[in-house]
């Protein structure tokens, strides 16, 4: 433990030192925003349009819980005028690093702009909250609106432009929220159970009335044992759940263990698809947008859980 804490302290010190010593290399007059995740980048881009250059540190398939900054990432953070991250410990120790930079530049924890009453408690860590707020589309819309107000503080000349964009995106999210509700209602009530590798979908479950079960905890750093697998297998078999799901940013090993356990008990459950949980799809694709990511997930969830297990 001592060695890990020592390395962590050194890591923070080196990053902060690099911000103090290294020269800035960016286009003069152009605001540069660096985001941690693709979901946040998507939100920022929908607000600022082409007025600002926006980058994300974590691309498709990257698990923010396990993320480690590269030299290239540190350079981006150094050059950024504004840094936007999720907060609520989604980025792990990196969040602590970013907080220490707020006296040098504007640093925004997007999720933490919301009131605490909006959060789901993290049962693994006392006093902490579940960071996966983007799976409640309506809650994400509220976070986007609050983020827009923060960005306007840095660029009041474009206030009208930002407000217009935020309102347009909010309307799209309202439509998305209603579409998700409508699609989820197609699933038989007794099959509205979403089983995934880690517990990233609690906000989705709360918003759309779905029972959510994850083999790992809220963070992929959480470990699981044979008893966890056995208990989840028993639940799936007893409730005749037709499909379970892998995640694009999490190893399939855990869910494959559950799959084999179910089959060993005579329940032919299937992998309903790979869901976008902590990262979006490839840039330039529909799934590489927040709206596309949600649509893709819901399509797979509805398709998999609507199957009649007795017809298999």
Residue map of PLM features:
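Bacterial N-terminal signal peptides that target proteins for export
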Residues: 1-9
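Extracytoplasmic metal-acquisition and chelation regions
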Residues: 21-312
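Bacterial N-terminal signal peptides
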Residues: 9-18
